Amino acid sequence: LGMYRKGIIERIKQDKELNSNFVGGSARNREQLYALNLLKDDDVPLVSITGLAGSGKTYLTLLTAIADLHAGKYQRIVITRNVIPVGKDIGFLPGDMNDKMMPWIAPIMDNFRQGLKDKDLTYFNVMKDKGDIEIAPLAFMRGRTFNDTFLIMDESQNSTIHELKTVITRIGE
């Protein structure tokens, strides 16, 4: 497996593991290995991953973000997604913005739980309370700049080109 870079084909590193004190995971196939190498590559500022449901797109991205946060590469993780329901909408949700976003980030929470070594979401909640992880609705992206941030845009296939451009142009240093 190789990647074309600067006029040559470089061999993909076979390091399938992604471990820190808090999370652990590994690539299960060549596609995941390729995605993991792109996510871990500091020379690649934007990675877009496509695949079937359950292929590990969100899982690998989230684990990489947490490992990079703990390695000091980033100051925080921002997770966003479009709030477009699959079926009929259930209407307005009670609570503050975090409460309203919880049903939409349930897949991310599932992936976080899967990647945590102790399988307890307390760690996620502590990180969220400290501001290390932020849940940001796509509707409120305008005017923001994300410096020193690992930005995850989950389920981006539900977004328009305008929404995608809005998010991409928010990425700072």
Annotated model-derived regions:
Residues 46:
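Walker A (P-loop) ATP-phosphate-binding motif of ABC ATPase nucleotide-binding domains
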Residues 49-51:
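Hydrophobic anchor at the beta1->P-loop junction of P-loop NTPases
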Residues 1-16:
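Interdomain "pre-motor" coupling segment immediately N-terminal to P-loop NTPase/helicase cores
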Residues 59-127:
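Conserved P-loop
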Residues 54:
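Walker A (P-loop) phosphate-binding loop of P-loop NTPases
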Residues 24-43:
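N-terminal pre-P-loop "Q-motif" helix
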Residues 41-42, 70-72, 142-145, 159, ...:
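Conserved catalytic network of the ASCE P-loop NTPase/AAA+ motor domain
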Residues 131-166:
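Conserved RecA-like ASCE ATPase "motif II neighborhood" in helicase/translocase motors
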